Amino acid sequence: MLVLGIESSCDETGVAVYDSESGLLSHALHSQIATHRVHGGVVPELASRDHVNYLVPLVDEVLTKAKIRKNQLDGIAYTAGPGLIGALLVGSCFAKSLAYALNIPALAIHHLEAHLLAAKMETPSLDFPFIALLVSGGHCQLIEVNNIGEYRLLGDTLDDAVGEAFDKTAKLMGIPYPGGAVLANLADQCLSTPYQFPRPMTDRPGLDFSFSGLKTHALNTWNQSAKKQGDRSEIAKAFQQAVVETLIIKCKRAIKESQSKRLVVAGGVGANKALRSALQKWINDIKGEVYFPALEYCTDNGAMVAYAGCLRMMRGESDGGLGVMVKPRWPLA
């Protein structure tokens, strides 16, 4: 089965072709960072316009790379939520229209489910069940994954998502958008820090997260410093250490409670070097398994949508009719 995947939930336009027999045939991505940098953050209207401009060229590009024609496609999967409503509508309307023209099924895909399954796309031997740590700009969740569509929410953020906390902390210290990755790089390059930040919500039971207080702590520390580059790096180091250790403490609890030793990391923050290294070391110590998507599949992309769509379409699933229903807010579990 050949499935075209379309991702347009926020500020990246992703398109890919996945084959149920051969795997991922091609994928392409357009990032809108340059479009939004001047505004200091994502502007929804501009995001939608960029998707309109790039969807057709990207579809043509991936089909050419895969050496297939549109009429060879068996289905089209598209992100239907959660995300920016305008951006979602651009992708969904395009997908439904193209599917109608080709007389093939279209299927709405949950953005977070696509992230959860990204590691399985590269490692088909990854079996259910597993615990997933979903860490991105909009989400920070621990999820028990028992099968496709069978999810149980174990823990969620009570305020900022972890990627959001990185970006906001960077902005508070004068790092331009998108600052989260820059903040992480500063932390990685800093050998040591005199600062010790709190590990929020680790002094009580439960698997929920909270990062807004950590962000405030970083701001207060920055304001009390000389505000030199060295101070910025040391604060970044302390902030990242606190985030990583907090995530690991919660993962340890989730693994212990579930009695599973299989962990999957998903979402854009899954590309963080310090987090990957710390999780790998801990999992090795307990003789467990941890799966990370390749860096290019951590952030939003069309490949994960095409893969999730292929898995569901092979079970006979598809949208009914031409109605386009996107869900800016759409709980996974």
UniProtKB/Swiss-Prot annotation:
Binds 1 Fe(2+) ion per subunit. The gene is tsaD. One of its GO terms (cellular component) is cytoplasm. Pfam families: TsaD. GO terms for molecular function: iron ion binding; N(6)-L-threonylcarbamoyladenine synthase activity. It comes from Legionella pneumophila (strain Lens). The keyword Transcription does not apply. Required for the formation of a threonylcarbamoyl group on adenosine at position 37 (t(6)A37) in tRNAs that read codons beginning with adenine. Is involved in the transfer of the threonylcarbamoyl moiety of threonylcarbamoyl-AMP (TC-AMP) to the N6 group of A37, together with TsaE and TsaB. TsaD likely plays a direct catalytic role in this reaction. Substrate binds at L134, V135, S136, G137, G138, D167, G180, N272. This is tRNA N6-adenosine threonylcarbamoyltransferase. InterPro entries: ATPase_NBD, Gcp-like_dom, KAE1/TsaD, Peptidase_M22_CS, TsaD. It catalyses: L-threonylcarbamoyladenylate + adenosine(37) in tRNA = N(6)-L-threonylcarbamoyladenosine(37) in tRNA + AMP + H(+). Its cofactor is Fe(2+). GO terms for biological process: tRNA threonylcarbamoyladenosine modification.
